[in-house]
């Protein structure tokens, strides 16, 4: 199920408060404004619906998936604590979105910028900090061409 921002963030906060660790994935569509400008908002809406379907296929049933607004989405995957465990999930996400079929796009591939941060069960910071870490990674990913993911590394992890 795709949660709205309020519902999804509340569920993630509850998971963090209960000591549940996991991977927080934040992503948005590259050049979404260009899709709306060149193909129309109706096609942009179809892209968002297709992304919602692709995201639901990528993540597990117990994962918390949310649309934050506009072209920004997020997911929290309980029990995935490392880059090694998270990379295959992120690769599936990118591949699933790139292979979406939106006929009105005439074969154009939709790319996403992805930021990933991990929350360990013994971490003691807020959802806002977790979001900030993933958001800074999404910003770094936007600097590349095409779909790209950046993983947050906490200095304390080294």
Regions picked out by a protein language model, each given a short descriptive name:
Residues 1-23, 30-60, 66-70, 74-75, ...:
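Conserved long alpha-helical elements within nucleotide-processing catalytic cores of c-di-GMP signaling
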Residues 24, 73, 112-116:
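A structural signal for short, well-ordered beta-strand segments
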Residues 37, 76-81, 98, 119-120:
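Residue-level recognition of strand-loop junctions within catalytic nucleotide-signaling folds
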Residues 67, 97-113, 142:
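Catalytic core regions of nucleotide second-messenger enzymes
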Residues 84-86, 96, 100-104, 145-158:
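Inter-domain helical "communication" segments and dimerization helices
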Residues 91, 119-146, 156-157:
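Catalytic-core segments of nucleotide cyclases and related cyclic-nucleotide turnover enzymes
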């Amino acid at each position: 199920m795709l949660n709205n921002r309020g519902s999804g963030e509340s569920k993630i906060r509850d998971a963090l408060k209960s000591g549940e660790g996991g991977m927080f994935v934040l992503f948005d569509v590259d050049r979404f404004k260009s899709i709306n400008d060149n193909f129309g908002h109706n096609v942009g809406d179809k892209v968002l619906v297709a992304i919602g379907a692709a995201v639901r296929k990528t993540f597990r049933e117990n994962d918390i998936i949310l649309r934050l607004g506009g072209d920004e989405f997020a997911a929290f995957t309980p029990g995935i604590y490392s880059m090694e465990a998270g990379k295959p999930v992120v690769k599936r996400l990118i591949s699933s979105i790139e292979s979406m079929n939106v006929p009105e796009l005439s074969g154009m591939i939709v790319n996403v910028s992805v930021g990933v941060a991990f929350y360990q069960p013994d971490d003691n910071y807020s959802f806002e900090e977790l979001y900030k870490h993933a958001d800074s990674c999404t910003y770094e990913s936007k600097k590349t061409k095409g779909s790209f993911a950046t993983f947050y590394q906490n200095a304390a992890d080294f």
